[in-house]
Amino acid sequence: GWWPNKLVALLNVIQQIGWAAVGCITGGIALSAVASHHLSPRVGVVIIAAISFCFSLLGLRVILVYERYAWIVFFVIFMILFGEAAPYVDNKTPTSLEGSALPGAVLTLLAIVYGSSASWCTIASDYYVEYPANENRIKVFLLTTLGLAVPTSIGMTAGAVAASTLNNQPAWKDAYDEGIGDALLNIFRPSGFSHFLVVMLMLSAVNVNIMNTYSAGLSIQQMAKPLSAVPRFIWTFLCFAITIGLGVGGSSDLNQYLQSFLSLLGYWCTSYFIIILEEHAFIRRGKFTNYNLDAWNDPNKLPHGIAAAVAFGLGVVAWVMGMSEDWYVGPLADLF
């Protein structure tokens, strides 16, 4: 509907800016480590944000070309990480968590992984609009599924492998206490090569942020017609400024920022996806010919969206009942 979609656009802006801040924090911490901490992580956050902002101004086609090939570099780096860390993996030391703390930690990780992947559903159309209208749907589905599952699995597995080595490598653990960048510098060898790899890995933050800032600008324009009349680069600059503020504020505690933000994404993204899926399956009967594409920006031809708004509201009730965050624990979650 016309009006509920404004809320979705606002939530998407918050989500994309939050993701951009995550990228800036991780990239800034890594950049500080490469500079032997002569550079503040906060300055690193600003540098990453500025590079991302400049790239996002180049337009969608340039972004797509960059994204098409950038993954190769990061894939190679992750494979090197596996090779360097694998000899020191510790899969024998029992966990120190007891009782409900262990399943709670597992569920938190699953929520973070799910939330990071599910957030793609709210921006996919920003990029899939470039596909021909007659593109094979199975091909798009498979590419999307693999494009989410494979990188997420590699990243999560690499993190688990690297974390498990800390029991066997006290020096790496001490470095990790200083920051993720210091840990990577110790894992990668030799020293000069490790600096190069961490700098390249830092660019993965730029890789993510380019899409975040671009999509955030689009979502701002969708919130109201007067906003769509403002050039997109102005909204992109505004997102850039907010990202710097969040990144600088969250750079002191990356893990807490990640858990507090990323675990929230799965809540509203799931509600959004389910509503869209139900409309397509039951109201549109699974046929794209039942959509009036010419009415996408005409409130007189679009439904009011009351049913979708109510469904979304019921979803919010479910979130509040079951969520367990540092700042709030719902009544259902409090039972466990």
What does each model-identified segment do?
Residues 9, 35-58, 72-83, 116-124, ...:
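Transmembrane alpha-helical segments of multi-pass small-molecule transport proteins
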Residues 82-88, 98-164, 189-213, 301-319:
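Hydrophobic, membrane-embedded alpha-helices of multi-pass small-molecule transporters
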Residues 58-71, 119-154, 167-182, 213-233, ...:
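Hydrophobic, small-residue-rich membrane helices and short re-entrant helix-turn-helix hairpins
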Residues 42-47, 222-256, 297-319:
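Loop-to-transmembrane helix boundary motifs in multi-pass membrane proteins
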Residues 7, 26-36, 49-70, 85-88, ...:
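Membrane-water interface regions at transmembrane-helix termini and the short interhelical loops
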Residues 272-336:
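C-terminal membrane-solvent junction of multi-pass transporters and transport-like membrane proteins
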